[in-house]
Amino acid sequence: MRRPLVAGNWKMHGTRASVAELIEGLRRQELPVEVDVAVFPSSLHVTQVVEGLAGKAVKVGAQDCAAQVEQGALTGELAVSQLVDGGCELVLVGHSERRLILGESDEVVVSKFAAVQKAGLTPVLCVGETREQREANATLGVVGGQLAAVIDALGVQALNNAVVAYEPVWAIGTGLTATPEQAQEVHAAIRAQVAQLDAQVASELRILYGGSVKAASAAELFGMQDIDGGLVGGASLNADEFGAICRAAGN
């Protein structure tokens, strides 16, 4: 039985004051014990969040990292070892905003994925298609290719200590969301792709849905067989909304 995971990606949001308010709101939430919960603040606020949520069953992750574990001369980047030191347990890799806006290639994503695992943290591999790719019926090919880049380079066993998040790019921050059936189709295809190589890895792999997840839509999405939780964007900046999404995963 796969344990649900709900992860909040705060993206490039927050001041020390607003993050303190969000921490306080999260501390008030009754979170289901059967659901793993994580938040991904900006790197500037990681320490504040780790300290503020101490004793609360919420893991803290980083939104990105350098493609190396060790510290070194790489201005503006964060080595994975620094994230370990800061209290992070997970790291997002390959988020669509980094792929599309910042030009991160599959090769860069693979390098970051490997560095995160080498340091003992859990990578959350983001995959997804654009509106144009969906309209061209290329969704499964695009998503499958992004997943295959990691498997081909590191082996299917690399997914044993990893999470995959399917995020249809056309649904991120747009208010649009894939229907539960659309999301399930892609999640099932991801699991089937992994199962062709290792059935046990596939059965244990947690696959999250990320694309304008809201409390109102969460229960129906999470009710799908191959959807194991959510990577939540804007809604995670509201503690009550995020708490409701977490509770939906527990139901």
UniProtKB/Swiss-Prot annotation:
Write the Enzyme Commission number(s) for this entry. Answer: 5.3.1.1
SUPFAM superfamilies (alphabetical): Triosephosphate isomerase (TIM)
UniProt keyword list: Cytoplasm, Gluconeogenesis, Glycolysis, Isomerase
Record keyword Acetylation present: no
Task: Name the enzyme group at the top EC level.
Answer: isomerase
Task: Name the positions where substrate binds.
Answer: N9, W10, K11, G173, S212, G233, G234
Signal peptide residue numbers: none
Which pathway does the database say it acts in? Carbohydrate biosynthesis; gluconeogenesis; Carbohydrate degradation; glycolysis; D-glyceraldehyde 3-phosphate from glycerone phosphate: step 1/1
Q: Which GO terms describe its biological process?
A: gluconeogenesis; glyceraldehyde-3-phosphate biosynthetic process; glycerol catabolic process; glycolytic process
Indicate yes or no for the key word Isomerase: yes
Instruction: Recall the GO molecular function terms of this protein's record.
Output: triose-phosphate isomerase activity
Q: Could you tell me the superkingdom of the organism this chain comes from?
A: Bacteria
* Subunit structure and binding partners: Homodimer.
What role is this protein assigned? Answer: Involved in the gluconeogenesis. Catalyzes stereospecifically the conversion of dihydroxyacetone phosphate (DHAP) to D-glyceraldehyde-3-phosphate (G3P).
Q: Which family does it belong to?
A: Belongs to the triosephosphate isomerase family.
State the protein's name: Triosephosphate isomerase
